[in-house]
């Protein structure tokens, strides 16, 4: 799924990038995927207040804007101050509506939902369109996580999400695997899982996220 850029310069850049990628790509199932071109999309990042959903949404917004798309955003902060982790009152979200034409609202229903835990899924799932893309962090769906979200069964196993395109991703395990060479402790690596999810969304939308995120977190010289 890719948004068509508005700027001719951006189109030329993307064509050049794709040509360079094709020259080195191997013939894999991923390399044979043909993205569906659409003119707009609404995406929502949702998780605990400490999961970095606001910065993740902001970075995604910056990149989308660099590609020449019109945007409207809706940051959603919980009313509670530091609600217990994993609970319904502590869910934070960031919604972005971006398009190749003018955008006037952040959107009502969403095309893509990224849920970092069961509470985020429960609070936001009603807004996801049928056949919408649902990405969940399966590492956070343990018994204790489900109990905090007031769930009695695991929604990833009871077919209640069958009307969506569900991608159950081990975000914590994959993030740790990607960062294991840096010598970070487990807690520090787990704090980066929001940017792993951000990278997945860049790929999903055929965006080169490097331009919007490469300087984030670097100390200014």
Say what each PLM segment does.
Residues 2-221:
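Active-site cofactor/cluster-binding pocket
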């Amino acid at each position: 799924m890719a948004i068509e850029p508005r700027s001719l310069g951006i189109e030329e850049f993307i064509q050049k990038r794709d040509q360079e990628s094709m020259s080195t790509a191997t013939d894999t199932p991923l390399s044979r995927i043909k993205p569906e071109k659409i003119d707009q999309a609404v995406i929502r990042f949702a998780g605990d207040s400490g999961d970095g959903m606001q910065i993740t949404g902001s970075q995604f917004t910056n990149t989308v804007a660099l590609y020449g798309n019109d945007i409207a955003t809706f940051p959603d902060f919980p009313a509670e101050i530091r609600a217990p982790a994993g609970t319904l009152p502590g869910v934070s979200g960031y919604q972005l509506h971006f398009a190749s034409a003018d955008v006037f609202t952040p959107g009502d229903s969403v095309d893509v939902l990224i849920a970092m835990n069961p509470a985020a899924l429960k609070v936001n799932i009603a807004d996801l369109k049928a056949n919408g893309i649902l990405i969940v962090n399966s590492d956070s769906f343990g018994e204790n996580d489900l109990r905090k979200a007031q769930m009695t069964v695991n929604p990833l196993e009871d077919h209640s999400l069958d009307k969506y395109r569900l991608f159950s991703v081990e975000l914590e395990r994959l993030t740790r695997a990607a960062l294991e060479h840096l010598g970070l402790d487990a807690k520090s690596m787990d704090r980066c899982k929001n940017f792993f999810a951000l990278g997945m969304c860049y790929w999903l939308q055929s965006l080169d996220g490097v331009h919007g995120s490469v300087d984030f977190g670097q100390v200014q010289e």
